């Protein structure tokens, strides 16, 4: 076992020695000649100085123009041939300073352009152009780089002064242009005032004069009309229209007299007719005939049994005779005659069809019509699918079933129209195969145009109507909350009092216990709220009736009544109504055209088949000739069928006793009724007595009324004449009033037009005033702080003469000229190797002696945990001591300034403790694998150092843990970044490493983990 342990120790020692030798060789080759490079750069003149430019400037706006002075500074340096400039990021520049790729880093700060354009500031802030030189340079090289920075800064200050002067001149030119624009606008306003208002107002009095003349004329006609009407009324005698009510009108008398005579005559005639009919009716003959018929029925009933056989014999003889006649008939057409007729008829029809010019013209016309119909049908299908620019509304969207359902159709309708869309796509593909690429057609892409058509809501709006009756004893306030997506027009009536539909609170009359609420208005969708409205497609209007705060009843615990009258209109249907109807109409039209297209498709233009037609006609004629024999056989079969059914038919006729009995009973009843009628006719009717003297009273009444009616007629004629004269005067008055109305309408239209013009002119003048005010405001800012009272502003003058100052980003290192400074890379590498050796010592001791137990486990079950804590403390303390020693040595070697030494030593101690704790845990827990991980981290660091070029940092530098430690010390030594967060992270890592070493799991069997 001991021999095996020594073999492991020897292998690890060899690996560490090889790593140290490789590191020393690498560092020597990479950093050994750094001082030589510094001295050599002095002798190679200024063009050997590499300057990294870091542009962090953000653009700004001045006088409406975009200003980027950082880019201008870089372009200025691009023309400089004495030095080598490169524009890089800050990380690349710092890496270049670190490895000698750059001698100077110039940083253009973020607010460079903003601070440089402080021409209007009273006390402008200084602009600093930051720079940093590489660590470890010779004093002569450092002085040369300072000179380079100063020269670059002086040149750029000169350019800035030129920019300031140019800006001032541009402001003056802009002021000159704006003054000219102001004069042009004023001239335009004066011209509009003369044309729009002054001239129309001068013509305005003429309209009033015409209206006055027409009004005076109408007034005269009205006065004349009333005078004539009054005169007619005064001249009329009221007694004339009084009629003696004791008499009826003559027309009633005449009608009554005539009606009396007519009824009297009709009565006489009816009596005469009755008497004549009585004498002419021969009831005895009818009765005797019916009795004779009754006796015949009795005789027929008795003879049924004896005559049945005779009927059967007679029917059979007739059928046999008919059968013999039909059988004797023969066909007039022989077989040879039929064939000859077939041949002759065929030749005749062929000649007729071949030489018939009208038939050929008809066939050609049909062919041309079919071709023209197919062409028109294809054009119609093309127009149904394709959307023409601007005007076309009959086109087809590429809609799916879900699109139709979203537009408001049910599933059956959606399936129907989806099938039509598929037909349109099928026809589109067929059409494109036949046409060149330039004539291809496509369905219009669908983007919810049908389901989201808000034009009707924007233009027409939606009606808002509601009627409600609210009863409450404590309601005294109405709160109206409108939908922010809509503009509301209309009013809310509460017990007849109107309020506008808008967001407001209204105090109600508390004397009322019942409120009748009527809402009537229109809500129009706002154009800018269309997108938000389409999320729920609902319009809301809330009317909340409640009670305002009652300060006089603070202890009243009675619940307050609240009535919520909310109107929610789901407008989903309004979004698709017009557009959906249009789309469905287009689809139905295409479907009809496509069905006609599929019916006509595939019909080839074949020649007319004359032979088939001739054969069909000849066969029809020949079949009729040959069917004689078949018809004869059919007739014989019918005769046989009649003979078979003859017995049944005779039996049905002769055995109908029930019907015979019923007829006999009906005849007996009819004979009895006629006997009763005969007795009635034998009696003489009594004639009615009529008093014809009553007619004289009606004649007397008519003669008395004639005089009264005549007198009324004369007065009516006079009144009619007066009325006609009044009508003519009224027509004249109506014409004059119409003319007055026209003049008033003209006045109204002219006044309205003048109002519109005045508003336009007012808006134009307001816009001009706004533009002038803006110009004055902006021009006032130009160099407003150029003077401090009556004196020149010295601060602004000093800023404009030398705006940009240089600022050296000081390093933590005390650079003492010709003294070389150790690199942080070598420093980090030495700390890591020292931690690896320390970790291996702890690991070897534990393998040889076992786990360190400062407290025996026998006394308490918790002593094992305390031993782990003490072990972790020993490891951490070792790292702390090593970090303190290394930090003191590095502090002197780096020549760290006095104010930064404590933080530097703290960083080194924490870093060393992290290295020792983590590496010790890896070796104690995973042994060989831990050693592999430690060496892998070291290898990544070597690769990262080799890739640390001026062009940028590679991927290995980002994944290498030691590279982050290296950057941490480099940034601190160059005073670039604060270290507060760094110290917190290191402290957390120390705690994690301490805890990990407390919980080491020892395996019973030795193995390679």
Curated annotation (Swiss-Prot):
The chain crosses the membrane at residues 7-27, 822-842, 869-889, 903-923, 928-948, 979-999. Component of the type VII secretion system (Ess). Provides together with EssB and other components such as EssC and EssE a secretion plateform accross the cytoplasmic membrane in the host. This is Type VII secretion system accessory factor EsaA. InterPro entries: T7SS_ABC-Transporter, T7SS_EsaA. Residues 680-707 are annotated as: Disordered. Residues 680-697 have a biased composition (Basic and acidic residues). One of its GO terms (cellular component) is plasma membrane. It comes from the Bacteria. Disruption phenotype: Deletion abrogates the secretion of EsxA and EsxC into the extracellular medium. It is found in: Cell membrane. Homodimer. Interacts with EssB. It is a multi-pass membrane protein.
């Amino acid at each position: 076992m001991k021999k095996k342990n020594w073999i492991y120790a020897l292998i690890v020692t060899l690996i560490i020695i090889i790593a140290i030798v490789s590191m020393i060789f690498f560092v020597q080759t990479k950093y050994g000649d750094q001082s030589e490079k510094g001295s050599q750069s002095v002798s190679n003149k200024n063009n050997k100085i590499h300057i990294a430019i870091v542009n962090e400037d953000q653009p700004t706006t001045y006088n409406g123009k975009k200003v980027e002075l950082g880019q201008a500074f870089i372009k200025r340096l691009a023309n400089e041939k004495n030095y080598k400039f490169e524009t890089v990021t800050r990380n690349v520049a710092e890496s270049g300073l670190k490895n000698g790729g750059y001698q100077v880093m110039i940083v253009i700060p973020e607010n460079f352009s903003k601070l440089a354009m402080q021409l209007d500031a009273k006390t402008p802030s200084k602009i600093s152009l930051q720079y940093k030189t590489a660590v470890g340079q010779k004093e002569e090289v450092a002085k040369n780089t300072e000179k380079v920075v100063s020269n670059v800064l002086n040149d750029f200050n000169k350019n800035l002064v030129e920019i300031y002067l140019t800006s001032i001149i541009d402001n003056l030119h802009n002021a000159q242009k704006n003054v000219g624009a102001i004069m042009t606008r004023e001239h335009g306003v004066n011209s509009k005032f003369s044309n729009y208002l002054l001239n129309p107002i001068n013509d305005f009095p003429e309209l009033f004069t015409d209206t006055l003349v027409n009004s005076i004329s109408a007034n005269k006609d009205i006065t004349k009309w009333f005078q004539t009407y009054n005169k007619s009324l005064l001249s009329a005698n009221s007694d004339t229209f009084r009629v003696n009510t004791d008499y009826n009108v003559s027309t009633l008398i005449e009608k009554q007299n005539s009606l009396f005579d007519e009824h009297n005559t009709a009565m006489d005639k009816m009596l005469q007719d009755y008497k004549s009919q009585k004498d002419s009716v021969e009831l005895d003959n009818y009765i005797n005939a019916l009795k004779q018929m009754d006796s015949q029925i009795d005789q027929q009933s008795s003879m049924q049994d004896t005559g049945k056989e005779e009927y059967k014999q007679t029917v059979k003889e007739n059928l046999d005779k008919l059968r013999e006649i039909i059988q004797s008939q023969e066909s007039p057409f022989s077989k040879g005659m039929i064939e000859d007729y077939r041949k002759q008829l065929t030749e005749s029809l062929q000649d007729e069809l071949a030489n018939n010019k009208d038939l050929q013209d008809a066939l050609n016309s049909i062919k041309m019509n079919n071709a023209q119909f197919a062409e028109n049908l294809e054009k119609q299908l093309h127009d149904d699918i394709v959307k023409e620019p601007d005007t076309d509304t009959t086109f087809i969207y590429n809609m799916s079933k879900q699109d139709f359902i979203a537009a408001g159709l049910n599933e059956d309708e959606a399936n129907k129209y989806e099938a039509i869309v598929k037909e349109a796509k099928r026809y589109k593909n067929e059409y494109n195969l036949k046409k060149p690429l330039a004539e291809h057609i496509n369905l219009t892409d669908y983007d919810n145009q049908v389901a989201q058509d808000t034009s009707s809501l924007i233009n027409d709006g939606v009606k808002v109507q509601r009627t409600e009756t609210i009863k409450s004893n404590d309601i005294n306030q109405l709160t109206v909350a409108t939908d922010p997506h809509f503009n509301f027009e209309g009013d809310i009536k509460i017990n007849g009092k109107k309020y506008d539909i808008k967001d407001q609170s209204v105090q109600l009359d508390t004397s009322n216990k019942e409120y009748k609420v009527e809402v009537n208005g229109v809500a129009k969708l706002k154009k800018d709220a269309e997108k938000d409205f389409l999320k729920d497609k609902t319009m809301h209007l809330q009317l909340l009736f409640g009670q305002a705060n009652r300060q006089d009843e603070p202890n009243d615990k009675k619940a307050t009544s609240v009535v919520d009258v909310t109107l929610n209109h789901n407008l989903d249907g309004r979004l698709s109504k017009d557009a959906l109807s249009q789309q469905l109409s287009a689809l139905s039209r295409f479907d009809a055209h496509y069905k006609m297209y599929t019916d006509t498709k595939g019909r080839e233009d074949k020649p007319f088949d004359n032979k088939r037609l001739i054969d069909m006609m000849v066969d029809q004629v020949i079949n009729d000739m040959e069917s004689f024999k078949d018809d004869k056989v059919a007739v014989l079969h019918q005769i046989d069928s009649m003979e078979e059914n003859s017995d049944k038919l005779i039996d049905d006729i002769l055995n109908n006793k029930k019907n015979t009995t019923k007829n006999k009973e009906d005849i007996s009843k009819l004979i009895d009724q006629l006997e009763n009628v005969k007795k009635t006719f034998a009696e003489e009717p009594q004639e009615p007595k009529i008093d014809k003297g009553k007619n004289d009273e009606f004649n007397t009444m008519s003669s008395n009324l004639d005089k009264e009616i005549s007198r009324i007629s004369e007065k009516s004629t006079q009144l009619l004449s007066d009325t006609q004269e009044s009508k003519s005067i009224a027509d004249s008055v109506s014409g004059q009033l119409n003319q007055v109305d026209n003049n008033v309408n003209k006045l109204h239209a002219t006044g309205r037009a003048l109002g519109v013009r005045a508003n336009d002119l007012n808006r134009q003048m307001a816009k001009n005033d706004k533009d002038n005010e803006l110009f004055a405001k902006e021009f006032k800012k130009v160099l407003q702080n150029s003077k401090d009272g009556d004196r020149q502003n010295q601060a602004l003058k000093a800023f404009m003469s030398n705006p940009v100052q240089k600022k050296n980003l000081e390093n933590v290192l005390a650079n003492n000229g010709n003294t070389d400074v150790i690199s942080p890379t070598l420093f980090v590498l030495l700390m890591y190797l020292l931690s690896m050796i320390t970790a291996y010592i702890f690991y070897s001791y534990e393998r040889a002696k076992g786990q360190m137990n400062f407290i025996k486990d026998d006394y308490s079950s918790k002593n094992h945990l305390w031993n782990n804590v003490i072990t972790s403390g020993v490891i951490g303390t070792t790292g702390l001591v090593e970090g303190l020693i290394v930090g003191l040595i590095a502090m002197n070697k780096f020549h760290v300034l006095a104010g930064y030494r404590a933080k530097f030593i703290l960083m080194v101690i924490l870093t060393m403790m992290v290295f020792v704790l983590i590496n010790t845990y890896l070796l104690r827990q995973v042994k060989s694998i831990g050693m592999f991980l430690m060496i892998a981290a070291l290898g990544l660091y070597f690769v990262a150092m080799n890739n640390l070029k001026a062009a940028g940092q590679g991927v290995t530098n980002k994944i290498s843990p030691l590279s982050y430690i290296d950057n941490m010390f480099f940034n601190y030594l160059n005073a670039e970044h604060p270290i507060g967060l760094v110290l917190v992270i290191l402290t957390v890592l120390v705690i994690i490493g301490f805890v990990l070493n407390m919980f080491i799991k020892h395996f019973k069997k030795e193995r390679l983990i």
